[in-house]
Amino acid sequence: MAEAAQAPQQQFAIQRIYLKDVSFEAPSSPVMFQKEWNPDVKLDLDTQSRELGQGVYEVVLRLTVTVKNAEETAFLCEVQQAGIFSAEQMEAGQLAHCLGAFCPNILFPYARETISSLVVKGTFPQLNLAPVNFDALFMNYLQQQAQEGATANA
């Protein structure tokens, strides 16, 4: 009896999640603690990935939170949350989505918790970052790349 050849199945696994870099600065303290608290929060985020070996990738999620109060920087918090992931038997588009959206979705709660903890340790009111839709950000990135490619070819 002949067995039908089976296509290789996609495999994904988390090998490690770790804190790669962290920084917390409160340049206006202790004067800031005496002012009325009316914060202006700015969040910048970025992702980066690189191949470590065949089918093994490091993904780094960078979050920078800048909080100003009365036009002065109350605090600046930077976190690089990283993970090592194995992703095998994926087509190029699937792999790009995995590294650009799926893995950052896994890393974000860890980065959010680190930021919240640092802010509280700086004795500022707790900061709870809203969830981020990395799938939508990734789709916007793809659309932007397509538009830039079309402009370059025109």
From Swiss-Prot:
<dbReference type="Pfam" id="PF02556">
    <property type="entry name" value="SecB"/>
</dbReference>
<keyword id="KW-0653">Protein transport</keyword>
<dbReference type="GO" id="GO:0005737">
    <property type="term" value="C:cytoplasm"/>
</dbReference>
<dbReference type="InterPro" id="IPR035958">
    <property type="entry name" value="SecB-like_sf"/>
</dbReference>
<keyword id="KW-0143">Chaperone</keyword>
<comment type="similarity">
    <text>Belongs to the SecB family.</text>
</comment>
<dbReference type="GO" id="GO:0051082">
    <property type="term" value="F:unfolded protein binding"/>
</dbReference>
<keyword id="KW-0811">Translocation</keyword>
<keyword id="KW-0813">Transport</keyword>
<dbReference type="GO" id="GO:0051262">
    <property type="term" value="P:protein tetramerization"/>
</dbReference>
<comment type="function">
    <text>One of the proteins required for the normal export of preproteins out of the cell cytoplasm. It is a molecular chaperone that binds to a subset of precursor proteins, maintaining them in a translocation-competent state. It also specifically binds to its receptor SecA.</text>
</comment>
<comment type="subunit">
    <text>Homotetramer, a dimer of dimers. One homotetramer interacts with 1 SecA dimer.</text>
</comment>
<dbReference type="GO" id="GO:0015031">
    <property type="term" value="P:protein transport"/>
</dbReference>
<keyword id="KW-0963">Cytoplasm</keyword>
<dbReference type="GO" id="GO:0006457">
    <property type="term" value="P:protein folding"/>
</dbReference>
<protein>
    <recommendedName>
        <fullName>Protein-export protein SecB</fullName>
    </recommendedName>
</protein>
<dbReference type="InterPro" id="IPR003708">
    <property type="entry name" value="SecB"/>
</dbReference>
